[in-house]
Design a protein with these regions (language model features):
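Short beta->alpha hinge that forms the Motif I/post-I loop of the SAM-binding pocket
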Residues: 30-34
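C-terminal target-recognition/interaction regions appended to catalytic cores
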Residues: 253-438
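Extreme N-terminal starter segment of soluble prokaryotic enzymes
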Residues: 1-5
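A short, Lys/Arg-enriched amphipathic alpha-helix followed by its capping loop at the start of a domain
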Residues: 17-23, 42
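S-adenosyl-L-methionine
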Residues: 38-78
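Class I SAM-dependent methyltransferase "Motif I" SAM/SAH-binding loop
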Residues: 8-9
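Glycine-rich SAM-binding Motif I of class I
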Residues: 12, 16
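Class I S-adenosyl-L-methionine
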Residues: 70-84, 94-336
Length: 438
């Protein structure tokens, strides 16, 4: 049985993929108490019991040592009066907020330094193989005066991969060139590019990156993933009359328990939908499949749009623009509305988008407020987002469903747990490459 450690484990996307590939997770760690509840609950479902055959440690990685990890593994019941095994793989995705191209980037963000702590733990545990996963922005993040684990001071402007490869080489690990993998190429119904960095202890067989398992023309679509979760029964029967194989796999389960059998979903969890006002619902109605907020605004101004069946929007625009309701309808029905007038109708937000049903989803993020369901004028449930990430339906996300404001800095509610996760099927594809050479 190959053994793995999952650091920065989050809700457990990587762990799901590793277990599907055949690994046993002996130790995992994350800093979030919200994540801990979800992660432990799932592992109990799978027969991975705290203190018996696995250990989760809620900890800042800066406080986590190889000695602590070895101690917890040695105390597991399965190793009673036995030597603890060599660790085959450490996998981890250091917090990526400072690297991300999806939002603001801050070179001084202390979270950018966590990959150095990851290298430290690798050096203290000495696994056979290592995998680091992160956002694409990881590869071109520059550091100023970075001092490595071995005391090397790197020139200002040195990029992360250069530092990482040098640091790993200094502690006895060779590395492959980092590669961008798209989750959609590995059976995930989502366009999600992630940088994967693989390393191996010097003298061992080098791993390879996985080749795509799905051709571009055969990528799974949003309809394949969540068509059976349409809430309107008549619409669901018309659009998704028969479950797809992906839907069946999600329902029946992919991740095996310690007994080797996946867990079918007895009931669907995480299906609660956000409450929406009439104005928001009517705005969502205006979007065509695949259309962004900026393109909708352009269409309103250059072509016109019929809002005669949108009473809440008519009233809003009438009051704000000081026009009679019939004049509001006429204003937007034909070309010529100004940008300011269009923004009263639509708001100034340009990032909203109605996802297209016949394509993989866009990248699932931690805030789902601006993504619109293709068949119903609403945002997505946590379960729908989890389906797009390739989580089993039996995987239940616990804790608060969402959060806001300054609490986003420390809380990891359900939507964030899903959006931060590595898609299990992507993690599985990479982990299988390690299994091949062990």
């Amino acid at each position: 049985m190959p053994y793995a450690i999952d650091l920065f484990c989050g809700a457990g996307g990587c762990s799901e993929g590793l277990i599907q590939a055949g690994f046993h997770i002996l130790f995992s760690s994350d800093i979030s108490d919200m994540v801990e509840v979800t992660y432990k609950h799932r592992h109990e479902q799978l027969g991975l019991i705290q203190g018996k055959n696995t250990w989760f440690e809620r900890s800042d990685i800066r406080d986590l040592t190889g000695e602590t990890i070895r101690k917890h593994i040695a105390e597991l019941e399965i190793f009673k009066q036995k030597d603890i095994p060599e660790i085959d793989l450490i996998i981890g995705g250091p917090s990526c907020q400072g690297f991300s191209r999806a939002g603001r980037r801050d070179k001084s963000d202390p979270r950018n330094m966590l990959f150095g702590e990851y290298v430290r733990v690798i050096n203290e545990i000495r696994p056979k193989y290592i995998i680091l996963e992160n956002v694409e922005g990881f590869v071109d993040m520059q550091f100023m005066g970075y001092v490595g684990l071995t005391g090397i001071t790197y020139p200002d402007g040195t990029v992360t991969p250069t530092i990482l490869r040098s640091e790993l080489n200094e502690i006895g690990y060779d590395t492959l060139e980092p590669r961008v993998l798209n989750a959609a190429d590995f059976g995930v119904p989502q366009r999600r590019n992630r940088i994967i960095f693989m390393g191996y202890r010097k003298g061992l067989t080098p791993p390879e990156y996985p080749e795509p398992t799905v051709k571009p023309e055969n990528r799974l679509t949003l309809l394949d993933a969540i068509g059976d979760l349409i809430t309107d029964p008549l619409k669901r029967a018309s659009i998704n009359p028969h479950p797809t194989q992906y839907q069946l796999d999600s329902i029946n389960g992919r991740t095996p328990t310690v007994d080797g059998n996946p867990i079918p979903a007895k009931k669907l969890t995480n299906t609660e939908l956000p409450k929406q006002t009439d104005i928001v619902r009517e705005r969502f109605d205006l979007f065509l499949p695949g259309e962004s907020g900026s393109n909708l605004k352009k269409r309103v101004m250059e072509i016109g749009i019929d809002i005669s069946d949108k009473p809440a929007l008519i009233e809003l625009c009438s009051n704000t623009l000081n026009l009679q309701p019939e004049d509001v309808i006429t204003l937007f029905k034909y070309p010529g509305a100004t940008k300011e007038q269009a923004e009263v109708l639509l708001t100034k937000k340009n990032i909203r988008q109605r996802w297209a049903p016949n394509q993989p989803s866009a990248t699932v993020v931690t805030i789902a407020d601006d993504y619109i369901n293709p068949w119903e004028s609403r945002t997505f449930s946590v379960r729908e987002m989890a389906r797009c990430q390739s989580f089993d339906d039996s995987f239940e996300f616990l804790g608060k469903r969402t959060t806001g404001g300054l609490l986003r800095r420390k809380e990891v509610p359900q939507y964030s747990q899903v959006g931060n996760a590595v898609p299990p099927l992507l993690a599985k594809a990479v982990a299988l490459e390690i299994i091949k050479i062990l």
